[in-house]
Amino acid sequence: MLIWLVELSEYFKFLNLFRYITFRTGAALFTSALIVFLFGPTIINSLRIRQGKGQPIRADGPQTHFKKAGTPTMGGLMILAGIVGASLLWADLSNVYVVATLLVTLGFGAIGFYDDYLKVTKQSHMGFSGKARLGIEFVIAGIAVYFMMRTALASGIAGSTFGSSIAFPFFKDFMINIGIMFVVFGGFVIVGAGNAVNLTDGLDGLAIVPVMIAAASFGVIAYLAGNVVFANYLQINFVPGTGELAVVLGAVIGAGLGFLWFNAPPAAIFMGDTGSLALGGTIGTVAVATKHEIVMAIIGGLFVIETLSVIIQVGFFKMTGRRVFLMAPIHHHFEKKGWTESQVVIRFWIVAVGLAMLGLSTLKLR
């Protein structure tokens, strides 16, 4: 919104700052963090009073988790307030990629909120129907992907099929055009990202830091992909307009920092599905917009590992009646093996940093 003040730069030279994505990204980070810091305590106290018993604790989980009983959930509301508030102030709201990303952020956040609401009121882990939840997620993601695809196609950059093509790391010119099926592919990426972060969110601070790492990585990618000079130099696909997504991701990082202040062990609040679905969906949408869907599987490799551990556990148990892991997702397996919660969290953070660096290195390897 504030970018519109650039029109007054003829009279107030300092307003030229608002032209620069880097400045507005930093401002969005600071603003979103400030929003969470200021309103966080009020939101936490309100949720604690309204929820009473807080988020239900799994009976089959590690014994150390029972001391967390009574901790309120839906902390994602704080994160959403920071992201949306800062984005409205600092991002270009006429940018289709920004609007599509915020649509997914709010849409997935609303789904997560309803799921959290059902879990808290029923004091059960059985929230929103799985099929219904996935169906609504796919609709929201599909709408966002469709409009982003149309925008990319209309730009005429890299040919008329660019918007509906899948790009591959290491090869700038190797792309596979799948036509309208790109909406399905992109929807799968976004929904998968949202639910992968959701599965990872099981320990204090475990999900939010890797999310910020991924957001920072994709902030760099979005900025480079949206700049024709850098894109040509690195031989990555130039996608006009995606640089503006760096501002939204700056807001994600700021909101994440603010939330971590309250989520640091012992957590005063959990983000719940409200936050995890929204954050994962946001990262997934940026990956689709910048044509780095496959790279996201590397940068967000920790989330992929967590998801695969659940798929393997469930699939193997259905086939053999036995379990591969002591408990899934895999972070609980290591807890059962004797790792302390802080050991699991910090070691997983280290893995997330390594994977992010590996993912970013693909930008130069062509």
UniProtKB/Swiss-Prot annotation:
<dbReference type="GO" id="GO:0008360">
    <property type="term" value="P:regulation of cell shape"/>
</dbReference>
<keyword id="KW-0133">Cell shape</keyword>
<feature type="transmembrane region" description="Helical">
    <location>
        <begin position="27"/>
        <end position="47"/>
    </location>
</feature>
<dbReference type="GO" id="GO:0051992">
    <property type="term" value="F:UDP-N-acetylmuramoyl-L-alanyl-D-glutamyl-meso-2,6-diaminopimelyl-D-alanyl-D-alanine:undecaprenyl-phosphate transferase activity"/>
</dbReference>
<feature type="transmembrane region" description="Helical">
    <location>
        <begin position="294"/>
        <end position="314"/>
    </location>
</feature>
<feature type="transmembrane region" description="Helical">
    <location>
        <begin position="205"/>
        <end position="225"/>
    </location>
</feature>
<keyword id="KW-1003">Cell membrane</keyword>
<comment type="function">
    <text>Catalyzes the initial step of the lipid cycle reactions in the biosynthesis of the cell wall peptidoglycan: transfers peptidoglycan precursor phospho-MurNAc-pentapeptide from UDP-MurNAc-pentapeptide onto the lipid carrier undecaprenyl phosphate, yielding undecaprenyl-pyrophosphoryl-MurNAc-pentapeptide, known as lipid I.</text>
</comment>
<keyword id="KW-0460">Magnesium</keyword>
<protein>
    <recommendedName>
        <fullName>Phospho-N-acetylmuramoyl-pentapeptide-transferase</fullName>
        <ecNumber>2.7.8.13</ecNumber>
    </recommendedName>
</protein>
<dbReference type="GO" id="GO:0009252">
    <property type="term" value="P:peptidoglycan biosynthetic process"/>
</dbReference>
<keyword id="KW-0131">Cell cycle</keyword>
<keyword id="KW-0573">Peptidoglycan synthesis</keyword>
<comment type="similarity">
    <text>Belongs to the glycosyltransferase 4 family. MraY subfamily.</text>
</comment>
<feature type="transmembrane region" description="Helical">
    <location>
        <begin position="343"/>
        <end position="363"/>
    </location>
</feature>
<dbReference type="InterPro" id="IPR003524">
    <property type="entry name" value="PNAcMuramoyl-5peptid_Trfase"/>
</dbReference>
<keyword id="KW-0997">Cell inner membrane</keyword>
<feature type="transmembrane region" description="Helical">
    <location>
        <begin position="268"/>
        <end position="288"/>
    </location>
</feature>
<dbReference type="InterPro" id="IPR018480">
    <property type="entry name" value="PNAcMuramoyl-5peptid_Trfase_CS"/>
</dbReference>
<dbReference type="GO" id="GO:0046872">
    <property type="term" value="F:metal ion binding"/>
</dbReference>
<dbReference type="Pfam" id="PF10555">
    <property type="entry name" value="MraY_sig1"/>
</dbReference>
<dbReference type="GO" id="GO:0051301">
    <property type="term" value="P:cell division"/>
</dbReference>
<keyword id="KW-0132">Cell division</keyword>
<dbReference type="GO" id="GO:0071555">
    <property type="term" value="P:cell wall organization"/>
</dbReference>
<keyword id="KW-1133">Transmembrane helix</keyword>
<feature type="transmembrane region" description="Helical">
    <location>
        <begin position="93"/>
        <end position="113"/>
    </location>
</feature>
<feature type="transmembrane region" description="Helical">
    <location>
        <begin position="71"/>
        <end position="91"/>
    </location>
</feature>
<keyword id="KW-0961">Cell wall biogenesis/degradation</keyword>
<feature type="transmembrane region" description="Helical">
    <location>
        <begin position="245"/>
        <end position="265"/>
    </location>
</feature>
<keyword id="KW-0812">Transmembrane</keyword>
<keyword id="KW-0472">Membrane</keyword>
<dbReference type="Pfam" id="PF00953">
    <property type="entry name" value="Glycos_transf_4"/>
</dbReference>
<keyword id="KW-0479">Metal-binding</keyword>
<dbReference type="InterPro" id="IPR000715">
    <property type="entry name" value="Glycosyl_transferase_4"/>
</dbReference>
<dbReference type="GO" id="GO:0008963">
    <property type="term" value="F:phospho-N-acetylmuramoyl-pentapeptide-transferase activity"/>
</dbReference>
<feature type="transmembrane region" description="Helical">
    <location>
        <begin position="174"/>
        <end position="194"/>
    </location>
</feature>
<feature type="transmembrane region" description="Helical">
    <location>
        <begin position="138"/>
        <end position="158"/>
    </location>
</feature>
<comment type="pathway">
    <text>Cell wall biogenesis; peptidoglycan biosynthesis.</text>
</comment>
<dbReference type="GO" id="GO:0005886">
    <property type="term" value="C:plasma membrane"/>
</dbReference>
<keyword id="KW-0808">Transferase</keyword>
